[in-house]
Amino acid sequence: MFLSPGEGPATEGGGLGPGEEAPKKKHRRNRTTFTTYQLHQLERAFEASHYPDVYSREELAAKVHLPEVRVQVWFQNRRAKWRRQERLESGSGAVAAPXLPEAPALPFARPPAMSLPLEPWLGPGPPAVPGLPRLLGPGPGLQASFGPHAFAPTFADGFALEEASLRLLAKEHAQALDRAWPPA
């Protein structure tokens, strides 16, 4: 078997045929380097709200001379860093008691007698309203029938922590709205 020029193992599978172009390398975007001013403005905006809406992001992007998509990605990364820090802070405390974090983890003040279940029906105590069951945690009858270790505290604690985080976000959002639209 004789091969004509242009045929053969080099061109059959991996070579370029007539009219074909070399495959283009995937474009990889360079890492964004933020200026001190940009970082300061982004951090200030993050303090005001961890989840700014698209209009706030566009406004901030114009202010710091960045594309809105870079601001959006910065907020995603900053929220991930914030969650990681929260996890580390909550993990460094005493793990022996399945108690919820105390008020200092939250930036707003709370009377010392109240700790984190913000609503009475969330805590492990008796129901706030007689006749209504608690919404978190098993009742004494269920605990006795399933044994003391049947309900791990991780789900309830994680739920309460998530709720506290959402309450904080709602408060930050309300404060941001108050600053944006002062009462007339």
Curated annotation (Swiss-Prot):
UniProt keyword Nucleus present: yes
Gene3D superfamilies according to UniProt: Homeodomain-like (1.10.10.60)
GO molecular function: DNA-binding transcription factor activity, RNA polymerase II-specific; RNA polymerase II cis-regulatory region sequence-specific DNA binding
UniProt main location, coarse: nucleus
Cellular component annotations (GO), alphabetically ordered: nucleus
Biased composition (Low complexity): 1-10
InterPro entries named in the record: HD (IPR001356), Homeobox_CS (IPR017970), Homeodomain-like_sf (IPR009057), RAX/RAX2 (IPR043562)
DNA-binding region: 27-86
Segments for region (Disordered): 1-33
Keyword vocabulary terms for this entry: DNA-binding, Homeobox, Nucleus, Sensory transduction, Transcription, Transcription regulation, Vision
Pfam families, per the entry: Homeodomain
Coiled coil, from the record: none
GO process annotations (BP): positive regulation of transcription by RNA polymerase II; regulation of transcription by RNA polymerase II; visual perception
Subcellular location(s) of the protein: Nucleus
SMART domains: HOX (SM00389)
Assembly and binders: Interacts with CRX.
Domain topic, free-text comment: The Homeobox transactivates the Ret-1 element in the presence of CRX and NRL.
Role description: May be involved in modulating the expression of photoreceptor specific genes. Binds to the Ret-1 and Bat-1 element within the rhodopsin promoter.
Name assigned to this protein: Retina and anterior neural fold homeobox protein 2
Source organism: Gorilla gorilla gorilla
